[in-house]
């Protein structure tokens, strides 16, 4: 595509704002270059002609880590995509072509310098896992402990920053031609993506999350997370206890090892309610690739994306849950209205809202969790 493409020049003009923190060297030239790359990849996959689930996954992988993250989220949203697409996108949770081991060692040397061999007695060249953001290798400290090293992929932070900054610019510029209310939510979503990006790509934050999660759940005998070696962590490297176990999504293997799937689901839901309602500090990305079962315990192994709730928000969730338990549509409506960020009573058909809630409670109010199709519920 030509450099003077009218659309690209309009959206990514020289006066466009760069990233707010000014950390990634983003500018109109880098935006246009990346946008041409995105358009080229979409064109290569002939997306406008439609695609199979496999082609859609492959396109997201080619587009890079930001789009892989979006695909991971979509894999759990059967109310948005057909089931066959969701099933294919689950591969994005655990599968990604690994980088050469030499590149990972170079990244470690950049962080530790000549200390790497003083810290690690051995590092397995075969990765335990390779995701869009980072690669994990098993290692042994010189002190003898078995650990997992999470190493951020070189250059991935700058690419993700550029992608999200492009999304921000598109949303902001396009809003000039649309009603403000139509774009408000989209712009808020992009800003939330930026905040999540900053948190997930700074492994010092994940180290702090691991320590806080362990402390808050210390009395829960069936939930755990890896021990973190804070003094060995940095923005780009996380060192934590190596935890072996069965992925929570591997139902056949869990059953073969004597686990009760209903019991696991019940315990996980119980603890998740505790995280939200009591702690106000909860795992915000609990997809199957982030949770394993070891010795009867539910182990969260990736705490890069955590959420926090104020006391007011926790109380609001409690009111919603109580109303569902009582199968009271009026109380549920009031609880949802109190919890909403914005309330425009004039824009709400209260009678229809109550009728819809009544049907919702009739369908789901007395269901076991295992009986609920979450995607269908949300739709």
Residue ranges with predicted function:
Residues 90-124, 207-219, 255-274, 377:
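A short, contiguous, amphipathic alpha-helix enriched in charged residues
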Residues 139-140, 286:
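Conserved beta3 strand of the Hanks-type protein kinase catalytic N-lobe
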Residues 280, 285-287:
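Conserved catalytic-loop position in the HRD/HxD motif
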Residues 1-135, 158-188:
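N-terminal accessory/targeting segments that precede structured cores
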Residues 138, 145-153:
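Glycine-rich ATP phosphate-binding loop
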Residues 289-293:
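Hydrophobic residue at the +6 position relative to the catalytic HRD Asp in the kinase catalytic loop
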Residues 14-30, 191, 234, 243-245, ...:
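Helix-rich C-lobe and terminal helical cap/extension of kinase-like folds
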């Amino acid at each position: 595509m030509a450099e003077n493409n009218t659309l690209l020049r309009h959206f990514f003009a020289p006066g466009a704002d760069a990233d707010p923190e000014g950390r990634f060297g983003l500018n109109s030239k880098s935006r246009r270059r990346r946008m041409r790359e995105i358009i080229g990849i979409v064109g290569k996959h002939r997306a406008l002609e439609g695609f199979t689930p496999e082609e859609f996954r492959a396109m997201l992988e080619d587009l890079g880590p930001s789009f892989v993250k979006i695909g991971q989220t979509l894999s759990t949203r059967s109310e948005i995509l057909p089931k066959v697409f969701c099933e294919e996108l689950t591969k994005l949770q655990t599968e990604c072509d690994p980088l050469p081991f030499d590149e990972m060692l170079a990244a470690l040397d950049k962080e530790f310098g000549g200390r790497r061999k003083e810290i690690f007695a051995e590092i397995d060249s075969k990765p335990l896992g390779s995701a869009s953001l980072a690669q994990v290798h098993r290692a042994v400290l010189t002190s003898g402990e078995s650990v997992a090293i999470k190493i951020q992929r070189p250059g991935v932070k700058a690419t993700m920053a550029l992608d999200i900054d492009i999304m921000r610019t598109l949303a902001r510029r396009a809003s000039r031609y649309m009603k403000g209310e139509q774009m408000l939510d989209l712009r808020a979503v992009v800003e939330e993506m930026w905040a999540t990006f900053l948190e997930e790509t700074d492994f010092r934050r994940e180290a702090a999350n691991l320590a806080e999660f362990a402390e808050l759940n210390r009395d829960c005998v069936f939930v755990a997370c890896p021990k973190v070696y804070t003094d060995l962590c940095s923005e780009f490297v996380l060192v934590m206890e190596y935890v072996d176990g069965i992925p929570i999504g591997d139902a056949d293997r869990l059953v073969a090892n004597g686990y009760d799937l209903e019991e696991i689901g019940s315990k996980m839901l119980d603890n998740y309610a505790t995280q939200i309602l009591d702690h106000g500090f909860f795992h915000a990305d609990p997809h199957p690739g982030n949770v394993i079962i070891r010795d009867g315990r539910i182990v969260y192994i990736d705490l890069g994306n955590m959420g926090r709730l104020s006391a007011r928000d926790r109380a609001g969730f409690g009111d919603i849950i109580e109303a569902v338990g009582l199968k009271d549509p009026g109380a549920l409506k009031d609880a949802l209205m109190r919890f909403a960020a914005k309330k425009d009573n004039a824009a709400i058909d209260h009678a229809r809202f109550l009728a819809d809630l009544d049907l919702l409670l009739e369908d789901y109010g007395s269901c076991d969790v295992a009986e609920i199709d979450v995607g269908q519920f949300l739709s």
